[in-house]
A protein has these predicted regions:
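Helix N-cap/beta->alpha junction signal
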Residues: 25-26
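C-terminal accessory helical subdomains adjacent to catalytic cores in phosphodiester-
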Residues: 1-20, 30-51, 57-208
Length: 208
């Protein structure tokens, strides 16, 4: 696996399982992770914790301070933010600098361009979660073959579901059913695949 330039991983692996701390900008991202992490064998509070910031500006402003103040040993950090209209590399670089300045171990992942791109990458999960079976057939359409390229993924998902998708409750329903397969990858969102790979990298910090 190619190493990401925005990763700070400890080359000296310990025998103790790391504690994963996820830093996210909004409650919907928390719900997404709560649907994914337990299926990777992690238990909230015992194996992981999610810090929810009050939007992007709050994340950018307070991230370094929160990371510096963190005291739990053997912790590794996952920082997740939407790209939105920003330059992906610039957004990632800015967060990486804050991680580096804090002295903590971890990595940065960006949802290209919005969290909903993860869901548009697995329309079968959306169809099952929202009980709209016909949705799955749209996965091979040109628009949804590469959901990371959509500038308005949230709006697209709302229209596609007849506005049945709501950010927090929809994330809770859909994330629990998202495919976590990486070999072969099922989800068409490359940024979701990168997120899963990053989580597995962080967890591997505690393996011999």
């Amino acid at each position: 696996m190619k190493k990401d330039e925005f990763e700070l991983l400890d080359p000296i692996q310990s025998q103790k399982k790391p504690f994963l701390v996820c830093c996210v900008e909004e409650p919907s991202a928390r719900e997404m992770l709560l649907g994914v992490l337990p299926r990777l064998g992690l238990r909230e509070w015992e194996d992981f914790q999610i810090m929810v910031f009050q939007g992007k500006q709050d994340l950018e402003k307070r991230l370094e301070l929160r990371l510096r103040a963190w005291q739990r040993p053997q912790s590794v950090f996952l920082i997740l933010r939407d790209q939105d209209s920003g330059d992906c590399k610039a957004v990632k670089q800015g967060l990486f600098w804050k991680l580096m300045a804090s002295g903590q171990t971890g990595l940065v992942r960006i949802a290209c361009r919005e969290l909903e791109s993860f869901y548009l990458g697995d329309l079968q999960a959306v169809a099952n979660a929202l009980a709209i079976p016909a949705l799955a057939q749209y996965q091979n359409s040109q628009k949804f073959r590469g959901p990371d390229n959509l500038n308005n993924a949230k709006q697209e998902l709302q229209k596609l579901t007849g506005f049945h998708y709501q950010e927090v409750s929809g994330s809770r329903q859909i994330a629990a059913l998202l495919s976590l397969s990486l070999d072969p990858p099922i989800n068409r969102s490359h940024s979701f695949q990168a997120l899963l790979q990053g989580i597995l990298q962080l967890l591997a910090q505690g393996e011999k």
